[in-house]
Curated annotation (Swiss-Prot):
Region Disordered, annotated ranges: 1-20
Keyword DNA-binding: no
Listed GO MF terms: structural constituent of ribosome
Name recorded for this polypeptide: Large ribosomal subunit protein bL28
Signal peptide residues on this chain, from the entry's feature table: none
Superkingdom to which the source organism belongs: Bacteria
C-alpha cells in the first residue's frame, strides 16, 4: 500500500540527511499517516481511511460527508 493520504494526496518527499561534518545522504520524509475509522452518520457505518494528521483536521472542519463525496467524485473506492 502506498504512503499517500487519501484526503490531501500528501506523499513522501525526498531530501538529505546532513551530518555534523556536512556530509549529505539521500533520505525520504514520510507523511504522518494514520489508519482511522470515521463514523458516517448518513450511511450508518464506519469508513476506514488512511489519512495524514492534516487530513483529519480537514475532516473535522468540513465534515466526513463532504470529504467522502469528493473522494468518490475522484473515483476513489471508499
Amino acid at each position: 500500500m502506498s504512503r499517500v493520504c487519501q484526503v490531501t494526496g500528501k506523499g513522501p518527499v525526498t531530501g538529505n540527511n546532513i551530518s555534523h561534518a556536512n556530509n549529505k545522504t539521500r533520505r525520504r520524509f514520510l507523511p504522518n499517516l494514520q489508519h482511522h475509522r470515521f463514523w458516517v452518520e448518513s450511511e450508518k457505518r464506519f469508513v476506514r481511511l488512511r489519512v495524514s494528521a492534516k487530513g483529519m483536521r480537514i475532516i473535522d472542519k468540513r465534515g466526513i460527508d463532504v470529504v467522502l463525496a469528493e473522494l468518490r467524485a475522484r473515483g476513489e473506492k471508499v
